[in-house]
Regions:
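His/Asp/Glu-rich metal-coordinating catalytic cores
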Residues: 1-148
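Short, surface-exposed amphipathic charged segments that create phosphate/polyanion-binding patches used
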Residues: 35-40, 160-169, 274-276
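A general structural motif
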Residues: 99-104, 176-189, 204-208, 243-244, ...
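Hard-cation-handling environments
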Residues: 108-228, 232-234, 288
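Redox- and metal-dependent alpha/beta enzyme cores, enriched for Fe-S-associated oxidoreductases
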Residues: 220-254
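Generic long, charged, amphipathic alpha-helical segments
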Residues: 247-276
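Proline-aspartate-enriched helix->loop->beta-strand connector
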Residues: 277, 281-283
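Short acidic, glycine/proline-enriched helix-loop-strand junctions
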Residues: 296-303
Length: 303
């Protein structure tokens, strides 16, 4: 709408599409004619699934986005150990592993404590689905007292996570942590959030829209910005991390604050990708969902 473009679909199209949806539970195969489909928990975000498709004696696994390692929200995916004819697998981080989670959490918590004690605010631009909710759990696991402010689309998603808490690894802890935070629902609440002495978790993760970008203008000199997810080159998040600038209202704003990145990725690292492939023992492998060069290099390596 802002760009003056019209969406090619509307609410009536969504409602029509819903008629053809078939909800499925994890680990419960559904057979249509001669094709069987089973979804397994991918350990990525709420609802993410690894698909196992069987057709006339052949098996195909589509990993989608997955993570084997346990996080604050998910128990982690299990590998496919029955052998498949073809594996379609993500390659987002096929060239490296992620840092140790426990050490990274401790480092993150220590920086929050230092910043808050100095009277500053930690702004965490975060993805609405998954990352925002996990940050709440991480922060609360290390501090019960630091104020947390949740803003943007993350608020609605947080309620959805609570509604489907049975799919989380520690559902009651998530609900308790959610009840302990401040939901930002007005401009006054946003001003209070930047007064210093807390953590703001807000969309958008790449700072392309959402309230996060506007918070930067009101942070005091003791504050800092901490990214916890990938920012595509050319986005405001990438720009801030690499140049110390932000595009706001078609102007470049110099941001004189520390800007950091913590790798709390919800994707499998290189070692887990290799483990998944080894356990699945596929006849063929198709590498997808990654930088083109990275995916090609991984495919060549697997040959």
């Amino acid at each position: 709408k802002i760009q003056g473009d019209e969406l090619p679909w509307g609410m009536q199209h969504y409602k029509k599409a819903l008629k053809y949806w078939h909800p499925m539970m994890y680990n419960h195969p559904v057979t249509v004619r001669s094709t069987s489909v089973e979804f397994r928990d991918a350990g990525h975000i709420l609802g993410a699934a690894i698909a196992l498709i069987k057709y006339r004696g052949k098996k195909i696994c589509y990993s989608g986005d997955f993570k084997l390692e346990k996080s604050r929200l998910h128990a982690g995916a299990k590998t496919i150990k029955e052998g498949v004819d073809a594996l379609i697998i993500e390659t987002t981080y096929s060239d490296r592993d992620h840092p140790d989670r426990k050490k990274l959490e401790k480092e993150f918590a220590d920086e929050i404590e230092e910043t808050v004690e100095a009277g500053g605010t930690v702004l965490c631009p975060a993805f609405a689905v998954g990352r925002s909710q996990e940050l709440i759990r991480i922060i609360r696991a290390h501090s019960k007292d630091v104020p947390i402010y949740l803003d943007g689309m993350s608020k609605a998603v947080a309620r959805i996570y609570a509604k489907y808490k049975k799919y989380l690894c520690e559902p009651d802890k998530y609900v308790n942590d959610l009840e302990s935070i401040n939901i930002v629902d007005s401009m006054i609440a946003r001003k209070n959030a930047t007064a210093g002495g807390g953590v703001i978790v807000s969309t958008a993760g790449m700072m392309e829209g959402g309230p996060a970008i506007n918070y930067v203008k009101y942070l005091n000199s003791e504050s800092k910005v901490v990214f916890t997810g990938y920012c595509m080159e050319g986005t405001n998040g990438w720009l801030l991390q690499n140049t110390g600038q932000l595009r706001i209202d078609n102007n470049l704003l110099e941001v004189d604050l520390p800007v950091e990145y913590k790798d709390f990725s919800a994707h499998a690292g290189r070692s887990d990708l290799l483990k998944f492939i080894k356990d699945a023992n596929p006849g063929k492998i198709v590498c997808v969902h990654g930088d083109a060069e990275r995916a090609d290099n991984f495919a060549v390596e697997l040959k």
